[in-house]
From Swiss-Prot:
It is an enzyme of class 2 (transferase). It holds the Pfam family Sulfotransfer_1. Disulfide bonds: none annotated. Its EC number is 2.8.2.-. The gene is Sult1c1. SUPFAM superfamilies: P-loop containing nucleoside triphosphate hydrolases (SSF52540). It is found in: Cytoplasm. It comes from the Eukaryota. GO terms for biological process: 3'-phosphoadenosine 5'-phosphosulfate metabolic process; sulfation; sulfur compound metabolic process; xenobiotic metabolic process. This is Sulfotransferase 1C1. GO terms for cellular component: cytoplasm. 3'-phosphoadenylyl sulfate binds at residues 56-61, 139, 147, 202, 236-241, 264-268. Sulfotransferase that utilizes 3'-phospho-5'-adenylyl sulfate (PAPS) as sulfonate donor to catalyze the sulfate conjugation of drugs, xenobiotic compounds, hormones, and neurotransmitters. May be involved in the activation of carcinogenic hydroxylamines.
Length: 304
């Protein structure tokens, strides 16, 4: 059963709000933790493409770019189904009889494009064994936090985030679904040269989408014409995607995602965190950030 059918199950908000459990120190929904053995033993294939991100780091945007490249800029083909059906999250687990990510992935014909928010040490080992290609997208911590906070407010399948001040503390401590942002971006960065991983930055994609789309196409070994490239840039722009029901999650009932609280595609602008953090919160966050990122050579931009 698809997500759109969830309203027919007459589930209340209390039924959707997940209980959480830790798996290897990472906070997950109880449904995911109960199915962890199946997730861990997922069988990847050599021609799989995996899009890996921390939550709210540009997952859907990257997915649309990849889909457009794979389909030579054919917009109709890229609107064949909703984003979560075209490229499922392998770990996302829903109450029966709804289709979970594993169900969708296992039914897909090859070649598959799949997604995950899992930290690197929790990626099913078959992806390494099969040498699948992986695109990782990282976004600066402050913008990621604000976006994740508003997403958690509107998405009834995520834990209640509380106030922004409370959420900042949860985020810093890694006590949010999928764990610590710091460990996530560093973990994937540390293995990027050992595997077929293209590591991208959200801010670079916003600054020069043409350059970054070319990088993705090269990684996918796809030749695209200038005409197709420009088409991809246009159709994957924030304003166009925001109006695309196959990408913006508006086909879901408000009992699952309430767009009146916050749209799924909210602003997408680097530096928007400045409209939400107080000076004291920003200074405290920066001090904690320096401690947690000490020794890493990753450079993030908090505005462009």
């Amino acid at each position: 059963m698809s997500l759109e059918k969830m309203k027919d199950l007459h589930l209340g908000e209390q039924d959707l709000q997940p209980e959480t459990r830790e798996v290897n120190g990472i906070l997950m929904s109880k449904l995911m933790s109960d199915n962890w053995d199946k997730i861990w033993n997922f069988q990847a294939k050599p021609d799989d493409l995996l899009i890996a991100t921390y939550a709210k780091a540009g997952t859907t945007w990257t997915q649309e770019i990849v889909d457009m490249i794979q389909n030579d800029g054919d917009v109709q083909k890229c609107q064949r189904a909703n984003t979560y059906d075209r490229h499922p999250f392998i770990e996302w687990t829903l109450p029966s009889p709804l289709n979970s990510g594993l169900d969708l992935a296992n039914k897909m014909p090859s070649p598959r494009t799949l997604k995950t928010h899992l930290p690197v040490h929790m990626l099913p080992p078959s992806f390494w064994k099969e040498n699948s290609k992986i695109i990782y997208v990282a976004r600066n911590a402050k913008d990621c936090l604000v976006s994740y906070y508003y997403f958690s407010r509107m998405n009834k399948m995520l834990p209640d985030p509380g106030t922004l001040g409370e959420y900042i503390e949860q985020f810093k401590a890694g006590k949010v679904l999928w764990g610590s942002w710091y460990d996530h971006v560093k973990g994937w960065w540390d293995v990027k040269d050992q595997h077929r991983i293209l590591y991208l930055f959200y801010e670079d994609m916003k600054e020069d989408p043409k350059r970054e789309i070319k990088k993705i196409a090269k990684f996918l070994e796809k030749d695209i014409s200038e005409e197709v490239l420009n088409k991809i840039i246009y159709h994957t722009s924030f304003d166009v995607m925001k109006e695309n029901p196959m990408a913006n999650y508006t086909t879901l009932p408000s009992s699952i995602m309430d767009h009146s609280i916050s749209p799924f595609m909210r602003k997408g602008m680097p530096g928007d965190w400045k409209n939400y953090f107080t000076v004291a919160q920003s200074e405290d966050f920066d001090e904690d950030y320096r401690r947690k990122m000490a020794g890493s050579n990753i450079t993030f931009r908090t505005e462009i």
